[in-house]
Amino acid sequence: EMCIRDRNGIGEPVKVWTKPGVSKSVLVSHPQTTDDFNSYTLGLQWQFNHNPVNTHWSLNERRGWLALKALKAATLRESRNMLTQKCMGYLSTATVLLDFSALADGQRGGLFCTGSLYNGIGISREEGKNYLYLEKNGDVQQVKMVSGKKIYLRVMLDAKKNRCQLFYSFDNCNFILCGDAYSLKFGDWKGARVGLYSYNTLGIGGKCYFDWFNYDFN
């Protein structure tokens, strides 16, 4: 556990505290999580990991899809325009449909989970060929060459067991575990988050299109 203390006299967050009294029964509510990207603006549940480069993401270029245009970066951790959400609940599953038909050589994009470690699953394009790949804290592993233009990516998080697993599917029914499970670790001040990314190791170029992002938790 970690408590960030700035000692500014305003007060600090606590893990457990007395629930405020209310005058009547109220329904439990939570922030929106799932997104079909049909709106002209991003939902309030989304958070860019850094100040965004607004010329390189769009909800209008291809209606109903989020377009992430790749900027140059060496690794996932350095990627610009990472779009994230807070991890919710003890058990959660995030699934996304990625269209990788517009990738450029050197580009990587997909779904990731981050804290102090950056772990992602996605598609990389090298010398005109597309590969399913894993990226774990800077280490890149090509899994297999893929054809077609769409893939379903999934991350499953278990906060009680401190475990995160990555999956892929070509039909949104049969998901295949990809790589070993890894631990979640607190990092920076934002905590663990799940999100989408696109970057290019060679320069600026290429696009990832995300049709929807589905997030279930308990």
Task: Please identify what each model-predicted range represents.
Residues F37, V96, Y152-G179, F213:
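Carbohydrate-binding surfaces in secreted/extracellular proteins
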Residues E135-Y152:
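Short, aromatic/His-centered strand-loop micro-motif at the edge of beta-sheets
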Residues S58-L76, N130-L134:
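Short carbohydrate-recognition loop motifs
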Residues G205-N218:
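Exposed low-complexity, polar/acidic, P/S/T/G-rich flexible segments that act as propeptides
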Residues G9-F48:
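Extracellular carbohydrate-recognition regions
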Residues A73-K129:
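Secretory/extracellular carbohydrate-interaction modules
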Residues F175-G205:
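Flexible glycan-contacting loops in extracellular carbohydrate-active proteins
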Residues M2-I4:
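Short, small-residue-biased leader/transition segments that mark boundaries at the very start
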